[in-house]
Amino acid sequence: MRWLTFLVLGGLASAAIADSANSVRVCYNYGCLVEQEVHYSDSQLAQLRDWLGVARNADEERERLSLAIGQLLAWAGQQSPISADRGGNFADDGVYGRMDCIDHSTTTTRLLQLLANHGWLLFHRVAEPAWRVRYLFELHYSAQIEEIASSQAEGGDPARFVVDSWFRDNGRPAVVLPLANWLDGEGQVETGTGRVVTGGFAGSPR
């Protein structure tokens, strides 16, 4: 019977590892004050795998990442109060489940790492969150990726891009911009436009 016990324990351990690989802790209520684990099903992640797998180059992968992050946040909103999150910090002021740029940069970095851990980012690697300061006191953070091909080029700095989900309502595509443009202040808050994706993965921008 001992072999049966080991078999059961081994199966449980494998299931736990698989479950962990499909889970992410999302932050909300500003400053990552609250964290909640959300779990993505195999079928949900398979949709994203197929969606990202079509990308033929880094430009296309960034375009598809924009929608993929929006979808992951929408699915997370089905298990947590972040469905109430709106672009910027004013449209959802005081709402439980609201997210500031710290919540977004932390959560989106974790979502990007989830995709990377599955091997679905072929043209980018996940970098540390970026930050910018405007008007002395306006500090803003964003998740960040760097292009693999450019980082491997001799003598060249890697091309970096922000993946900023803070600008949009929950479920909307994340804003993806060259880091230099973002540091110069690009990126506009959009709210009240409705979700691009609800329920299942849309498969293409609308």
What are these regions (language model features)?
Residues 1-9:
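Sec-dependent signal peptide recognition
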Residues 34-35, 51-62, 90-103:
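Second-shell loop/turn segments in exported
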Residues 43-77:
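N-terminal, post-signal-peptide region of Sec/Tat-exported proteins
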Residues 69-124:
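Mid-length scaffold segments of soluble, non-membrane domains
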Residues 113-183:
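Hydrophobic/aromatic-rich core segments of domains that either
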Residues 183-206:
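Low-complexity, Gly/Ser/Thr/Pro-rich intrinsically disordered linker/tail segments
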